[in-house]
Amino acid sequence: MSRSYPGEQVEHAFNSKRLKNWEVPAVDKSQAISTSTGTRFGTLQPRSGRTQFIVDDNGHLKSGVPKLEKSAFNFTQTTPVFMDSAPRWPKENPTWPKNMKATMGYKGIQSNYLPTNTVTLKAVEVPGTTERNFNFM
């Protein structure tokens, strides 16, 4: 047995709620537009002016547009945010072995595609088991 759902039962979640930013406001631009939902922003002033492009079709700055001296991509040595902050990762422990390679599969089962001479896994030698302790480096 099949069920049929009316269109509004499925698609009402996908209907646009506030996508009316392309409409021309009905009031004069000198007046404030009050929000309908009473948000924390109170009344909103309409924006004036227009978007001006600062780059050409190739992505280069147009003439007359000033370059920013400092940005996130060309910071200097005097920037305290990057130079004086604490390191993100701790320093490497010199007592730990450097080349830890696992050549065993799931639960220590020997694999045929990795060599056994590079195993540095820590295991416990249990008498009567077929597992081997390869921690001999």
Curated annotation (Swiss-Prot):
Q: Which Pfam families does the record match to this protein?
A: CFAP126
Q: Which InterPro entries match?
A: Fltp
Q: Which domain of life is it from?
A: Eukaryota
Entry's localization field: Cytoplasm, Cytoskeleton, Flagellum axoneme
Does the keyword tRNA-binding belong to this entry? no
**Matches recorded under CDD domains:** Flattop
Q: Which UniProt keywords apply?
A: Cell projection, Cilium, Cytoplasm, Cytoskeleton, Flagellum
Q: What is its main location?
A: cytoplasm
Of the GO CC terms on this record, one is: cytoskeleton
- The UniProt record lists the keyword Cytoplasm: yes
Q: What does this protein do?
A: Microtubule inner protein (MIP) part of the dynein-decorated doublet microtubules (DMTs) in cilia axoneme. Acts as a regulator of cilium basal body docking and positioning in mono- and multiciliated cells. Regulates basal body docking and cilia formation in multiciliated lung cells. Regulates kinocilium positioning and stereocilia bundle morphogenesis in the inner ear.
Write out the similarity annotation. Answer: Belongs to the Flattop family.
> Which protein, by its recorded name, is this?
Protein Flattop homolog
Q: What species is given as this protein's source?
A: Chlamydomonas reinhardtii
